[in-house]
Amino acid sequence: MTTHTHHGSCHCGAVKFTVETPVTPAVRCNCSLCRRKGALMSPFFPAGALNIVSGEDSLTLYQFNTQVAKHYFCKQCGIYPFHQTRKDPNLWRVNIGCLDDVDPYALESSVADGKSLSVVEDA
């Protein structure tokens, strides 16, 4: 896995960030939230690899189920740019579709079985 510094943003540009991460192997998760948001996610990366350049005050937090994972969304446009994982709160993933220099449709992906991690009924 080759790590690059990527620039990214939400759709409206209120949230801008840089992240040092490889983009492959890309992953889709089958949990109830990820199924609905449909994002293609980067491999895990450490929290220190993410830098919010602007718009931290434009982010809103959504948590469900065990309340461990932290899913961030732009308050203005609703786009999900990144999340802190449930598996390890020191690890994050970024929505590859938010990266300026990457075509998410050109990447192959695997499926992460987030559905089996659920401890409550599917929403």
Model-derived regions, located:
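A short Gly-Trp-Pro
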Residues: 1-9, 14-123
